[in-house]
Regions:
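Basic, polyanion-binding surface patches
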Residues: 1-165
Length: 165
């Protein structure tokens, strides 16, 4: 008997994650998508990964662009997260954006960011893992935007609020 995918989704929804916007450039085109399936794979050598649905337009951009930036969102960036979670073209026009070393857009007001060169793509079911080598990065001050139980959340005194359970 196969494991129930909806049960897996419910279980993983109990795992609080940070919220990021993954950005990339392919030629003159830039794109971005909200992602919480982002991991630090290795410190030696430095490697990170983002998991992207094969049906998402971002999949093609990442595959062809060869680079990406992980922009970790601040607590007050819920609107940015929602913007990049929607399908279709992405509007960067009102955001402060810098071009990273790889050419990927960096959200200047992000809590932290990594600019990565794509080094490998691993097929994993209906999603692929894009492995990146960080070439540059920075951190800022503030609280992160979290995602828990299908909702945006925040840290309270070092713990996730329990009134959302």
């Amino acid at each position: 008997m196969a494991f129930d995918a909806m049960l897996q989704r419910q279980i993983m929804g109990r795992f609080a994650t940070g919220v990021t916007v993954i950005t990339t450039r392919f030629g003159d085109e830039v794109s971005g998508m909200t992602a919480n399936a982002v991991i630090s794979l290795s410190l030696d050598p430095p490697l990170v990964a983002v998991c992207v649905d094969r049906g998402a337009s971002m999949h093609a951009y990442l595959s062809q662009g060869g680079c990406f930036a992980i922009n970790i969102l601040r607590l007050d960036d819920e609107d940015i997260s929602k913007r990049f979670a929607k399908p279709g073209p992405k509007d960067f026009s009102d955001l402060r954006v810098e071009e990273g070393q790889t050419g990927a857009p960096i959200l200047s007001d992000a809590l932290a960011w990594l600019d990565c060169r794509l080094v490998q793509t691993v097929e994993t079911g209906d999603h692929d893992l894009f492995l990146g080598e960080p070439l540059a990065g920075a951190t800022g001050e503030g609280a992160p935007l979290l995602y828990y139980g299908g909702r945006y959340d925040r840290l309270v005194s070092g713990t996730v609020r329990e009134d959302r359970a």
